[in-house]
Amino acid sequence: MDCKVEIIPRLLHFRQPAGTSRGIYTTRKVWYLHLTSPDFPGRVGIGECAPLPALSCDDLPDYEVILAKACRRLEERQGRLDVDSLCDYPSILFGLETAIRHFFAGSWALCDTAFSRGEAGIPINGLIWMGDFDKMLSQIEKKMEAGFRCIKLKIGAITVSYTHV
């Protein structure tokens, strides 16, 4: 299939600062992939590449160059994804796989689930961002009330006294 991938960079702003062991995020750069084909006029596939700065293995200085090459390779291979060449770049592989899957689904919904309809979340891990003790405790309580059975704490360098636990 003849195809074209447009890369659309965006800078997202967190609603509240997100603390990690590597610093505090207030913004995050992402790249949206817009897949089209003259063989299927009007059909699109959207993917997202979003490595976390200082945390993702593919957060590299030349990320945009690698992403552009991966997109050109997909075009050259007529929409066939070269998974082996992208093993070291999981965020790029995810973005391209998602764009391709979305394209061939022929609809804005990747699959019809309560999650994709925005009716429910996926309570796998309730992530608690770093903050002071009271803020983190409040987040824990909210996650437990929301039904999370596994809670992941991002405590980094924060000292938590055993009297608090």
Regions inferred by a protein language model and the residue ranges of each:
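N-terminal capping/lid subdomain adjacent to the active-site entrance of alpha/beta enzymes
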Residues: 1-161
